[in-house]
Amino acid sequence: MKSNKYDIQDTEIRVIGESSSSPKRKWGWIILAAALMIGVIASIIAFSRTSSQEEVGVFEKAAHQPIPHPLRGWIQSLDRITDICVVTKDTTVNDIPMRLYVPLNMTPHLEVGYTCIDDTTNNMLLWQAADVRADNQKIVGAFVLRGKPLSWGLSKKGYCGIIGDQVTIGVADNSPLFEQATEVGGYFFRQYPLVSNGMLVENELKSQSTRRGLCELEGKVVVVETFTPESLHDFSQALVDLGTTNAIYLVGSSAIGWHRNIDGVGIASGQWEPRVYKNVSFIVWSK
């Protein structure tokens, strides 16, 4: 007798049911695999972020994170003052004690020689501007006095141009303000650059001394002076953290400075004697 393929033999075991897994079991495996994949990806991302962060040891200082300096609001409040005066403010930035001199309602000009420091009637604020060369005692860098060029050169890339009542502080190899000053009877001088567009400018000068800077701060021209000897790098960084947009150096150390305070009292700084450099220059604010 011919056997049927559906007949069950004595030695056979046949399982009755579907040969493939149920749909629910398939979806369960898919969901589990997806969850595992997501977990692996999340772990990789977290590890990469952790690896990219700077590892700071217990004896190291974390990276410097500057915060807005509280004097920024104070500078803006001076707009209400209409008198011709010099307002000062003492503060500390990055552990550097310093003083801000803010001349109000005045435009500076340049002077050469010591005559201006004896005029304590009209002058309100003055500081030495350009450096004097040690070899021939001439002015260092380009210098224009009331439209007349007294010196040429690009030993320092920082500059200050005074055209009419507009004061411009900047950093550049060549500035059109030099030519413009010669054409319209303006002023121009060069110094070490400290801050350019809110960024610190490095200089080769590494010594420490009292530092002074001519700065642009919230639309105003201010002079900043340290009370302690500082490197040019630390001084520049403090000016950046203070919020200055642009800044150049003014002669520091024992150089001559003078201002009339809000009470009308004249206060001198630096060494006023002996007066030996005929080409000494000053930036002066007068009534």
What does each of the following model-derived ranges do?
Residues 2-152:
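Zymogen propeptides
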Residues 89, 159, 213:
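Short, surface-exposed charged micro-motifs
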Residues 93-98, 162-166, 216-222:
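Beta-strand-turn-beta hairpins that frame and shape the catalytic cleft
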Residues 127-128, 133-199:
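Active-site-adjacent helix-turn-beta-strand microarchitecture at beta-sheet edges
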Residues 137-154, 207, 216, 220-245, ...:
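Conserved, well-ordered active-site substructure
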Residues 185-224:
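Flexible, glycine-rich surface segments
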